[in-house]
From Swiss-Prot:
One of its GO terms (cellular component) is 6-phosphofructokinase complex. Allosterically activated by ADP and other diphosphonucleosides, and allosterically inhibited by phosphoenolpyruvate. It comes from the Bacteria. This is ATP-dependent 6-phosphofructokinase. ATP binds at residues 11, 72-73, 102-105. One of its GO terms (molecular function) is metal ion binding. Transmembrane segments: none annotated. Substrate binds at residues 125-127, 162, 169-171, 222, 243, 249-252. Pathway: Carbohydrate degradation; glycolysis; D-glyceraldehyde 3-phosphate and glycerone phosphate from D-glucose: step 3/4. It catalyses: beta-D-fructose 6-phosphate + ATP = beta-D-fructose 1,6-bisphosphate + ADP + H(+). Belongs to the phosphofructokinase type A (PFKA) family. ATP-dependent PFK group I subfamily. Prokaryotic clade 'B1' sub-subfamily. One of its GO terms (biological process) is canonical glycolysis. Its EC number is 2.7.1.11.
Length: 319
């Protein structure tokens, strides 16, 4: 394999640039040319592809977002769209592709593999919802962004003796909410993967207030419901002054943490190794600090789960 491509797809995550950098530098180290596909699968179809050199990825390891940009692409879901994308790759002599993104990006890589084009997926999403890896690129940075927000909100919550509901990202996965809630000392954590008892949450807040607690923090993953609605109900049923903060897209931005830069570098380089070994239809990950790879179809068919022992611990520590 003498030429490979790399693209970023779906929601951006801090560390994607570090992964792109690793792909380019690892490939060039092995005398393999690298082409960047801009705007994800949309760029594959439109032919927005250019050769990347060492200088192309200079000064990006510390930058958030993605140098290659990203976009949604409904056309790629069609056979015609995929065939057009593959034709553009073959026109340039590109023989394999590294896809950095979440489960939707993995689905695209799977489809390309089914068309006979070798792909390797690299998990890039702040949601940490890709099976087969302990952590995804961007999760640690997003987590630290949320923790920073919790700490600052706690200061004002204490000053005004208020309850705060903080809504974080996670439509289908509660990892950000769970980890941030545990690290931030939240009184309650609501995630899509676990049932919750609103009456118990209300009772716990009342008990805390009765014993002199000056503030409370509740973390809600967006997939559970609206933080605003939770805030209204809490204030109505507890008579405690309650405010809501929806963190939104700030969780996706910012300079990647050291952990995300290292993770992205390791996974990006490993993806190139797999392609050069002729292994397509795979995706990479990290488990127990060791690099691993899996069949991408198996990963797509595996349901993501949160660590139940951590969820239980969060309940035990929030009494």
């Amino acid at each position: 394999m003498k030429r490979i491509g790399v693209l970023t797809s779906g929601g951006d995550s801090p560390g994607m640039n570090a992964a792109v950098r690793a792909v380019v530098r690892k490939a060039i180290y092995h005398d393999v040319e690298v082409y960047g596909i801009y705007n994800g699968y949309a760029g594959l179809i439109s032919g927005k592809i250019e050769k990347l050199e060492l200088g192309s990825v200079g000064d990006i390891i510390h930058r958030g977002g993605t140098k290659l940009y990203t976009a949604r692409c409904p056309e790629f879901k069609t056979v015609e769209g995929r065939e057009k994308g593959i034709a553009n790759l073959k026109k340039l002599g590109i023989e394999g592709l590294v896809v950095i993104g979440g489960d939707g990006s993995y689905m695209g890589a799977k489809k390309l593999t089914e068309h006979g084009f070798p792909c390797v997926g690299v998990p890039g999403t702040i949601d940490n919802d890709i099976p087969g890896t302990d952590f995804t690129i961007g999760f640690d940075t997003a987590l630290n962004t949320v923790i920073d927000a919790i700490d600052k909100i706690r200061d004002t919550a204490t000053s005004h003796e208020r309850t705060y509901v903080i809504e974080v990202m996670g439509r289908h996965a509660g990892d950000i909410a769970l980890w941030a809630g545990l690290a931030g000392g939240a009184e309650s954590i609501l995630i899509p993967e676990a049932d919750y008892d609103m009456h118990e949450i209300i009772a716990r807040l009342k008990r805390g207030h009765e014993r002199g607690k000056k503030h409370s923090i509740i973390i809600v993953a967006e997939g559970v419901g609206s933080g605003v609605e939770f805030g209204k109900r809490i204030e109505e049923e507890t008579n405690l002054e309650t405010r809501v903060s929806v963190l939104g897209h700030i969780q996706r931005g910012g300079s990647p943490s050291a952990a995300d830069r290292v993770l992205a570098s390791r996974l990006g380089a490993y993806a190139v190794e797999l392609l050069l070994e002729g292994k397509g239809g795979r995706c990479v990950g990290i488990q127990n600090n060791k690099l691993v790879d899996h069949d991408i179809i198996e990963i797509l068919e595996t349901k993501h789960t949160v660590e139940q022992n951590m969820y239980q611990l969060s309940k035990e520590l929030s009494i």
